[in-house]
């Protein structure tokens, strides 16, 4: 299972790289769960990341505005990200979500067909009015994405497992795999929960809080030693 660590700046990215993270995921926590960082930060992180590692970046917790979102996704792609993650926050239906992601895929793949597009839903979608998390695999498949992901929209101490049980997560992973896509799971994942995700067959686990000092995604900073510990748990 690959470990995706989400730094917010160059200093944290260096810690994530030194700790052995497999994917360096640039985000901006003050702007939300999948808050978008700035193009120059993505570019700086790409420049210091070893060639054998891939860089990911978030487009944001996006509205249902396919034009705006596809243009933003293009910006993420040309800034150097290999993975382009879109948080389907303002899309309320399957059709709206597919509409957004189709346009993102078209924009991103026009730059480089090898770029990896991630459709990200929210396990706690019912709290924010977003699209049903359990149809994210179909949305990813039908829009031409490469990865189906779940995170949590609200970072208030509740984790992925507080909203979806192991049975539902296993179904999500297996459905995603049946479409030939990769699965990614995140959402205030605790280090003791990594073994569960590994057992379920998850391809990528996304972490920020558990890699930060004090376990705090906002006030803490990513620490090399914590990343090393998480990497071992994923192996």
Swiss-Prot record:
Pathway: Cofactor biosynthesis; methanofuran biosynthesis. It catalyses: 2 D-glyceraldehyde 3-phosphate = 4-(hydroxymethyl)-2-furancarboxaldehyde phosphate + phosphate + 2 H2O. Keywords: Lyase, Schiff base. One of its GO terms (molecular function) is carbon-carbon lyase activity. Its EC number is 4.2.3.153. GO terms for biological process: methanofuran biosynthetic process. The active site is at 27 (schiff-base intermediate with substrate), 85 (proton acceptor). Catalyzes the formation of 4-(hydroxymethyl)-2-furancarboxaldehyde phosphate (4-HFC-P) from two molecules of glyceraldehyde-3-P (GA-3-P). This is (5-formylfuran-3-yl)methyl phosphate synthase. It comes from Methanococcus aeolicus (strain ATCC BAA-1280 / DSM 17508 / OCM 812 / Nankai-3). The lineage of its organism: Archaea, Methanobacteriati, Methanobacteriota, Methanomada group, Methanococci.
């Amino acid at each position: 299972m690959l470990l995706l660590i989400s730094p917010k700046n160059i200093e944290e990215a260096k810690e994530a790289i030194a700790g052995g993270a497999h994917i360096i995921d640039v985000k901006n926590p003050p702007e939300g769960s999948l808050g978008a960082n700035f193009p120059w930060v993505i570019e700086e992180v790409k420049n210091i990341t070893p060639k054998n590692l891939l860089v990911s970046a978030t487009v944001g917790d996006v509205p249902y505005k396919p034009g705006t979102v596809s243009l933003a996704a293009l910006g993420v792609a040309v800034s150097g990200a290999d993975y382009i993650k879109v948080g389907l926050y303002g899309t309320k239906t399957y059709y709206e979500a597919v509409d957004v992601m189709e346009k993102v895929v078209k924009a991103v793949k026009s730059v480089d067909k090898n770029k990896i597009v991630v459709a990200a839903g929210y396990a706690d979608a019912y709290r924010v009015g977003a699209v049903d998390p359990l149809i994210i695999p179909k949305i990813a498949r039908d829009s031409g994405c490469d990865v189906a992901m779940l995170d949590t929209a609200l970072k208030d101490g509740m984790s992925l497992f507080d909203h979806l049980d192991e049975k539902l997560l296993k179904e999500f992973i297996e459905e995603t795999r049946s479409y030939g896509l990769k699965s990614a799971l995140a959402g205030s994942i605790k280090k003791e929960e990594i073994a569960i995700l590994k057992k379920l067959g998850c391809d990528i686990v996304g972490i920020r809080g558990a890699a930060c000092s004090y376990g705090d995604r906002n006030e803490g900073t990513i620490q090399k030693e914590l990343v090393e510990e998480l990497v071992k748990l994923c192996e």
